[in-house]
Structures are given as C-alpha cells and as structure tokens.
Amino acid sequence: GLYEVVVGVLGGGQLGRMMCQAASQMAIKVMVLDPQENCPASSLSYHHMVGSFDESTKVEEFAKRCGVLTVEIEHVDVDTLEKLEKQGVDCQPKASTVRIIQDKYQQKVALLPAWIPLPEFMKIDDLKAKKWDSLDIHFMIKSRRLAYDGRGNFVAKSEEELSSAVDALGGFDRGLYAEKWAPFVKELAVIVARGRDNSISCYPVVELFTGHICHIVKSPANVNWKTRELAIEVAFNAVKSLEVPGVFAVELFLTKEGEILLNEVAPRPHNSGHHTIESCHTSQFEQHLPAVVGLPLGDPSMKTPAAIMYNILGEEEGEHGFQLAHQLMKRAMTIPGASVHWYDKPEMRKQRKMCHITIVGSSLSSIESNLAILLEGKGLHDKTAVCSTLLGFIMGSDSDLPVMKSAAEMMEMFGVPHEVRIVSAHRTPELMFCYASSAHERGYQVIIAGAGGAAHLPGMVASLTPLPVVGVPVRASTLDGLDSLLSIVQMPRGVPVATVAVNNATNAGLLAVRMLGVANDNLLSRMSQYQEDQKEAVLREGDKLEKHGWESYLKNS
C-alpha cells in the first residue's frame, strides 16, 4: 500500500467510517476501536476491535497493533495516551493537545498567547455577583468537558437565570465556565490541515446553519472576501499554535461589526467538512490520514463552484424513523448534483445524525433551490433544468428595452433564469451601487448591462462587482451609437467590460451563456447544439441558393 503502517482510530462512528472509505482509495490500512460491534466503521475498516476508547487496557491493547494512533472523537482517555507516548507510540494529535481541546476553558486559555480573537470568558466556581461584572448580563454558561452538538451550553440573560443555568448543567462540581454572549450574525467554520512537515492548508470558509446540531453547511460562505480572509487567518493561526499534524475544524462567529471570534476547535475531521468529499479536490478525510502519517497534503480548493450539506437527523424512534430518513434519501436521488452518505447506524434515535446529503452546483442559489425542492418532497426529474437566477439584465432606461430584449430572448431559448431591471448610473447611483456590489451574493454569475449616450452603466457596474460584465452599446439619437461604443469599450486597465457591437444584445446573451457554460455542462451542450443549428441553417441557405439561383432566392426570401 501507499503507507504500510496501520493507522488506528479511536472511535468507529460516521467520521471513522468516512476515514475508512478514504483510506481504501489510498491503500492505507485503518483499524478502529469502538464498543459497538456493528458501529458505522466496522464493515469498512481493516479491522474492528470491540472495546471502549476510554478504557485504558483496551486502548493499550489496540495501540500495539497500530503504527499511528488518531481520533475521530476527542473524548478519549488522555492519561492512557500520555502513557503510550512515553512508550514510543505515535499519537496524532498529541495527548497534550487532546487534553487542552477536551477542556473548552483550557482551550481558550491556550489560544490567548497566539492573539486569537475570542469572546470574553472566565472560570467560575460560585455565584458571587462580583465575578460577573466583566461579562455584563447576557452570557453563556458552558460545560468545560463532554460538551458537543449544543449540549452543555445554557444561555443566561439575567441574574435570575444564572442559578437555573448552573443547575441545568449539573452544578459547579461538573466544571463550568462563563463566556460573554457574542452577538454574531453568522456562524462560520474553516477546516485546516497541518502536515508533519508543518505545512498548513486551509479549506474555503463555510457557513453553518444550526439548531445546536450542525444541520446545514454552505460552501463557500456567503460573506465578502475580507471576511473570508480574516476567518482563514484566525483559523490558520489557531492551528499553527497547536503544533500537531492532522485535520482541525475551527468554528467561528462573525459579528455585526465584521469581527471574527473563535468559538472552538475540534482536533479531527468535522461535520462542517463533509461537503469536501464531493466539492473539493481533496476531502477532509483524504487529508487527515496523510497528515498524521507524514504524507504530503492534498489540494483543499473547491472543484465545484458551490456546495451545500444537509444532515438527516432522526425524526422518530425505531423503524418509523428509518422509513422517514429513507424517504428523504430517495428524494435526494432525483436531485441533480446530490450525493447520499448513509452512516449505517443500527439504532434510530431522535436528533441523531443518521446521514448527510451533499448537493453541488454552479452557484449557491441553484443548490439552495435544489435543497428546497428536496425538503419540500418534490422530485426533480428534469435534470437539465437550471434552478435559479444566474444572470442579471440592467439598462439605464426603458428606451433601451427594445434592444436589450434580444439578450433576454437568448436566455429564454437556453433556459437560463434571469432578472431584468432598470438601473441608471446617473439618476439612481445608490441603487446601482447596491445592485452591483451585492449581485454575487444573490447568486448571479454574469451581468449584462446596456446603455446609450454617455453609457457609464456597464463600466461603473464592472468596477463594483467581481462578476463578469457584458456591455451592450445602445444606439442613441445622435452619433449613431459610436459614443456608446467608445464609452463602454474604453475602460481603464483593471476594470474589464466585455463589449459587443452597437445594439447587438443577441451576442451579449450568447456570450453570457458561454460564460455560464464553463461550469454548467447542460448549457455547454445547448451552446454546442446552437452552433450546430447555426451551421445547418447556413448550409440550407447555400443549398437553396445553388438550387434556385440568386434572382429566385431574392424574390422568395
């Protein structure tokens, strides 16, 4: 195989299962230690040892058969890992790192020297009011250990709620800490891989939509580039400070002021990275195994423009719960770009993660539409359909519409949903600014802008959006459209506008379809057919001319 030493994984849940799937593709042998005989990873692993990953004797016995020991869950027996490391066992991540991350309070203390932005927090062991002054009234009471999927957290919005929060979490003896409420507007996450050579690779920033349990993940996150860069910087520095190889999930808060705050770190593959199996050149599981054994890291970039991951959670107990989950899986099979990952858990419980569905597509808006169709229970059988608005048409005045309608007709012919609006660069500059600067966030991929006379609209829009802009010079009442053409085509370096001929909105539409076709095989196929139809039309005209002669041809044309 690629790597002869056996990798041992403490835990055989769905993360262990997907590690085994990735390992089989790379010819890496993976053993799992899990107490459940028919755990999700059991049937796919090189070997499954039945036993608890927090039982010292079992972990020691397991480690004897492994060259590298890693985890799919951080709640393991760290004392045993430290003992094994002293005996020469290669544990990745290191026991010291797992110990820090197990305790969410110590995790934040450890990150402070690296200047990682964090919500205000403090250790608590009683209800003395003076200790709470720095955190104001609105705060989170959190369990330091064994807290995940929203468990172990309690919001306290008043002093009266504080006592209830402590009681709900099992009292101070369990180990609690307080964190000032972070008024976030989005929850983000970054999967970060670190190799044994200290190389670090970051996956694209994703957006989480949760009800405590991670439920929906969108990639890339619908945030501006500055926010993405800041999120990646925080995640990179957090993992760099931990100084151990492997894949880490860094969960973040985005505040209304645009600040990024670190929520927590997991030292393993994570639910927020499941989409990478279909959406990225190297999945988080294909990344974790090479990282811990010392092989090169892969490419974390996306190979599809957008992806969304949806967790199927148990809705009911027992057989009925399985039936409901299977119905949703069957519907997913009718959705273009959808992939189903069943975890093969033997028992159905409410709110238990049983499966995830990943949908990839040409834009976030298109995959959001497909997810809505899935959740509404409607099968999508026309797999050639484009599901959402991909293109925006704007013009400076309704007098431009007779010209611009030709581009709209092209969109209708190719089946590309589009939005047509009047936006004037001179009379509605605020509207133009909002439209152009947010177009990519609304899922648009191309903008066609038509203007006559001064014709500043296409260029101004191009200066405000990262999307490609196609400019249509509209013939005005003077100068026969030459003024419009020169205004649009003479853009300064760094602000490109793809400009077509005067009044040739048809070509603008066709060019936009070709741009969209780069990431849409259906549109690319339709464009190829359009070109073939054009060729056939010219050949028919040529045959007709040769057959009837030019005089007859002109009379009948």
Curated annotation (Swiss-Prot):
Its main location: plastid. Residues 387-557 are annotated as: AIR carboxylase catalytic subunit. Pfam families: AIRC, ATP-grasp, PurK_C, RS_preATP-grasp-like. Gene3D superfamilies: 3.40.50.1970, 3.40.50.20, ATP-grasp fold, A domain, ATP-grasp fold, B domain. It is found in: Plastid, Chloroplast. GO terms for cellular component: chloroplast. ATP binds at residues 132-189. Its EC number is 4.1.1.21. It comes from the Eukaryota. GO terms for biological process: 'de novo' IMP biosynthetic process. Pathway: Purine metabolism; IMP biosynthesis via de novo pathway; 5-amino-1-(5-phospho-D-ribosyl)imidazole-4-carboxylate from 5-amino-1-(5-phospho-D-ribosyl)imidazole (carboxylase route): step 1/1. The keyword Ligase does not apply. GO terms for molecular function: ATP binding; metal ion binding; phosphoribosylaminoimidazole carboxylase activity. In the C-terminal section; belongs to the AIR carboxylase family. Class I subfamily. This is Phosphoribosylaminoimidazole carboxylase, chloroplastic. The gene is PURKE.
